[in-house]
Amino acid sequence: MSFDSNLEELYQKFCKLKSILEDPSQLSVDSFVAASKEYSELLPVISVIDQYNSLQKDIADLEELINNPETDHELKSLAKEEFYERQKQLPKIKNKLKLSLIPKDRDDARNAILEIRAGTGGEEAALFVTDLYRMYTKYAEQKNWKFEQINSSSTGIGGHKEVSLCISGSNVFARLKFESGVHRVQRVPETEASGRLHTSAATVAVLPEIEEVDLKIDEKDLRIDVYRSSGPGGQSVNTTDSAVRITHIPSGIVVIQQDEKSQHKNKNKALKVLRARLYNLEKQKRDSEISQMRKSQIGSGDRSERIRTYNFPQSRITDHRINLTLYRLEDIMKEGNLDEFIDALIAEDEANKLKNLHI
C-alpha cells in the first residue's frame, strides 16, 4: 500500500469514528469510551494529514498554472518560485507526518517503578547500586518528579543489594524505560592496595506503575506471609510481624516488602510492585518486539550483558546500544544529568519505528 493510500485509509477511519460519536445512543458505554479514545488519538495525526494534503494541492495547482500556455510570463515566474518553495517544504511535512504515525506506547504517560539490583562484583556491585540510585533520584528532582522508596536491602557499609522506588510525574515511564538492562562499572575500589581495576555490574528494571482499576488481582491467587523484618546481617529490627511476602501463585512472582513499620503499608507497597510486574509480564506476551520477558529485560547481572559502561578512571560513560560516549561521569552520576543519553535513545527508537512503518 502506498503512502497516500495509508493516509486515505486513516482519514476514512477518522471520519467513521466521528460519525459514530455524533450518535452515541447506538453505542454501549464501553464502546463509546473506546471510540472516543481512538478519535482523540487520531486528532493530531489528522491535523498533520490536512497540512500535507493542503501542501500537495498547492503544488498541483501551481504546476497546472506553470504548464498552462495562457499563463503570462511574469505570473509563471512567480508560480515557479512558489512551486519550488512548496516542494522544499514537502519532505519536512512528510517526515512530521511519519513521526505522528509512529504507534504510541500507551504506558509512556504512566509513573514508573524502578528496581536496581547488584549483579556480579560483590560489595563493589552493591556500592554501584547506591550510585545508580542517587543518579536516578537526582534526575527525578531535575524533572520535578516525586519519588518514594518502596524497598531496599543495604549491605551496612554504604552499598545496597537492591533498592526499588516509585517515581511519579509527567512522562516518567517514557523517559526512563530505556534504562532497563545491565549497567557495568569499572573502577579501582578504595580497599584495592594494588590499584587494580575492578569490573562489576547492576541490573535496572523500569516497569510502568499500574493502578488497581487497570489490573485486578484475584485474592485466591495470592499467598501472603508475614514475618519480622530484618536489617543488615539478618538481625531483627522489628518486634512485630510487619514484613510482608506476597506470592502470586499462577505466575510464581514473589514480592517482599519490609521498609515500613506498618504491615498494612508494606502490603500495599508489595501489591503495587506485584501489579507492575504482572502487567509487564502480560505486555511482554502481547508484544515480544516491544518488551522482552522480564528476565531478558534486566539480564542476569553478568558483566558480558550490558547496555552501558561507567568507567571511573577515564570519567567516561558509554551507551553500547547507540554507541554514544560522554566524558562527564561525575556530572551524570552525581548530578543526574542524563538527558543527553535519554534524548538520543528516544530519537533512535523513533528512527527504528519509522523504518518499520513501511510507508
UniProtKB/Swiss-Prot annotation:
It is found in: Cytoplasm. Coiled coil: none annotated. One of its GO terms (cellular component) is cytoplasm. Methylated by PrmC. Methylation increases the termination efficiency of RF1. GO terms for molecular function: translation release factor activity, codon specific. Peptide chain release factor 1 directs the termination of translation in response to the peptide chain termination codons UAG and UAA. NCBIfam families: prfA, PRK00591.1. This is Peptide chain release factor 1.
